[in-house]
Amino acid sequence: MTMHALPRYAVFGNPVAHSKSPQIHQQFALQEGVDIEYERICADIGGFAQAVSTFFETGGCGANVTVPFKQEAFHLADEHSERALAAGAVNTLIFLKNGKLRGDNTDGIGLANDITQVKNIAIEGKTILLLGAGGAVRGVIPVLKEHRPARIVIANRTRAKAEELAQLFGIEAVPMADVNGGFDIIINGTSGGLNGQIPDIPPDIFQNCALAYDMVYGCAAKPFLDFARQSGAKKTADGLGMLVGQAAASYALWRGFTPDIRPVIEYMKAL
């Protein structure tokens, strides 16, 4: 059994080679003034539980979880935060002193902190449109609600899935093609940008939009953000700040140190 001298962390996914988490967490460690290990672990489909068990048995202190294992991580955890219970998914595993695993979900914190602290746009009292009804959107709704927006509307190509989330969280649902009216904040949680696609929404909904936000980052966010900008959105942003923000919240849960996300966002932009 190999034990490690430094505090050891990892991100589990499949695929995971593209993950920027190691660079982000090493920047956090520099802020704290400590040395850590942070690695990418590509778990086999069907082998996630064993991979996590091996990691923690050999000195792992905490782990991030990305697709496709967030729901499996939820079931693997011995206890859960309220956020994780509401989201039904876990992106952060914390190894407790009693040997148990605690599951949390920091995606919503990452999104909300990026919008309110980095982009300087208040969520309280605003109208929010969420595009998509998958796990990414479900994971952020609980924290968005904590910020007390005036209204949250979820729009999805398949109405039934949107209505399921609407009933679960006490928000509104509409078919994507029927979206109308202005929104202060429009958040794209669909994955269409990976294929160059944008959600089937009318351009006039961006006329009074203070922020159009895509939860993915880089080239995949460009189609939606270009469309939003051309349609009148005052400000646009990809999900890099959300990525760094959720990582910072995970780091704080593991180590009790809250990193400053702003310089790390700038560092990641420069890579």
UniProtKB/Swiss-Prot annotation:
The active site is at K70. It catalyses: shikimate + NADP(+) = 3-dehydroshikimate + NADPH + H(+). GO terms for biological process: amino acid biosynthetic process; aromatic amino acid family biosynthetic process; chorismate biosynthetic process; shikimate metabolic process. InterPro entries: Aminoacid_DH-like_N_sf (IPR046346), NAD(P)-bd_dom_sf (IPR036291), SDH_C (IPR041121), Shikimate_DH (IPR011342), Shikimate_DH-bd_N (IPR013708), Shikimate_DH_fam (IPR022893), Shikm_DH/Glu-tRNA_Rdtase (IPR006151). Shikimate binds at S19, K20, S21, T66, N91, D107, Y217. It comes from the Bacteria. This is Shikimate dehydrogenase (NADP(+)). It comes from Neisseria meningitidis serogroup A / serotype 4A (strain DSM 15465 / Z2491).
